[in-house]
């Protein structure tokens, strides 16, 4: 029997991680085409995660990176269009808010049903390029799959059809549970000479934190202040973008700050699990913090995870030295006193991939009939 032909499009580390369980299940139940746009082209930012998460190689690699953001976005749409014309998928699924998600514009023009994971997330901060993409992808998609009721309310306010909008939960619990033995087996602490609870883990790579000089300097000064205040190593998982800016601006770190290339999925989560505090601008830290129960501070001024704030999973620390250090002090003291957050219902489901696969199978025919009026 002919199976439904699904095209999954990814392009960045978070997309690969969060889609990994869905990719495996789609391989099992669909005629599945896996596409990597090449938005992140550094080995440590994508290929290593395919290996760690037990994913096969993509069927197609688009190589979309151009000489500027505009050319890259245009390449995403153009190259995705050409590929869709060639392979003729029955449906397309994307996750999140990256440039790679703009590939669905091609699918829309070709009248291919579109499914969007992580739909409805909003931080209400127009300085974030992701916020613009979220709105575009939400209203362009045919079926929106939200993590939480917060997200569903946000997206319904934009006028999308409620009958094509579902809350499926975050996929991270399913992903993390599946690889927990490998995370536990990681020897990264010993390899790096770190002790449990005696280091701070830092990840900062967002455009607004790195490319805006005032924000960059403020955040880097906060890093040095943390090292001095707590007199312990600060391990900075440093993305290529961040490393270039540090070199360009000649910033000097405290001797206790350790710059390290991006780590593999198992090693990074082992480090999060055992850190004195995790300080990050990553969008996944609320979900990982909810799973592992580590003290977490977000070095941002907004969040698209209000459901995690509702339960006290993390603290927003802004990016000034004083505010970040205050947030770290509060988060670590509360954790030491056993004053920990409540579980986030949207982050506990371990069968998200099953729900997503069934929704795709259910709605391709409905979208073709009700939206595109196909026979």
List the model feature ranges, each with a label:
Residues 1-232, 242-375:
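Nucleotide-activated sugar donor-binding and catalytic core shared by glycosyltransferases
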């Amino acid at each position: 029997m002919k199976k439904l032909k699904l095209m999954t499009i990814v392009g960045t580390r978070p997309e690969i991680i969060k889609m990994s369980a869905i990719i495996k299940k789609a391989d099992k139940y669909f005629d599945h085409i896996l596409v990597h746009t090449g938005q992140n082209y550094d080995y440590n930012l994508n290929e290593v995660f395919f290996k760690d998460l037990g994913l096969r190689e993509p069927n197609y690699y688009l190589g979309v990176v151009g000489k500027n953001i505009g050319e890259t976005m245009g390449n995403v749409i153009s190259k995705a269009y050409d590929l869709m014309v060639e392979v003729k998928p029955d449906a397309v699924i994307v996750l999140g808010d990256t440039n790679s998600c703009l590939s669905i514009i091609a699918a829309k023009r070709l009248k291919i049903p579109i499914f969007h994971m992580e739909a409805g997330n909003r931080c209400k901060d127009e300085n974030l390029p992701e916020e613009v993409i979220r709105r575009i992808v939400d209203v362009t998609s045919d079926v929106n799959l939200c993590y939480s009721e917060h997200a569903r309310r946000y997206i319904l306010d934009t006028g999308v059809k409620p009958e094509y909008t579902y809350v499926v939960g975050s996929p991270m619990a399913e992903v993390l549970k599946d690889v927990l033995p490998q995370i536990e087996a990681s020897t990264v602490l010993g390899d790096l000479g770190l002790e449990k609870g005696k280091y701070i883990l830092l990840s900062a790579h967002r455009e607004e934190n790195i490319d805006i000089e005032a924000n960059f300097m403020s955040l880097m000064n906060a890093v040095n202040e943390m090292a001095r205040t707590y007199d312990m190593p600060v391990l900075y998982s440093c993305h290529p973008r961040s490393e270039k800016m540090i070199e360009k601006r000649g910033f000097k770190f405290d001797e206790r700050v350790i710059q390290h290339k991006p780590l593999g999925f198992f090693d990074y989560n082992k480090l999060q699990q055992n850190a004195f505090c995790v300080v990050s601008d990553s969008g996944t830290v609320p979900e990982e913090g909810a799973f592992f129960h580590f003290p977490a501070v977000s070095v941002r001024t907004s969040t698209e995870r209000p459901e995690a704030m509702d339960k006290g999973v993390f603290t927003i620390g802004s990016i000034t030295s004083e505010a970040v250090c205050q947030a770290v002090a509060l988060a670590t003291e509360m954790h030491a006193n056993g004053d920990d957050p409540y579980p986030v219902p949207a982050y506990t489901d371990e069968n998200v991939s099953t729900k997503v696969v069934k929704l795709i199978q259910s709605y391709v025919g409905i979208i073709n009939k009700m939206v595109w009026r196909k026979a």
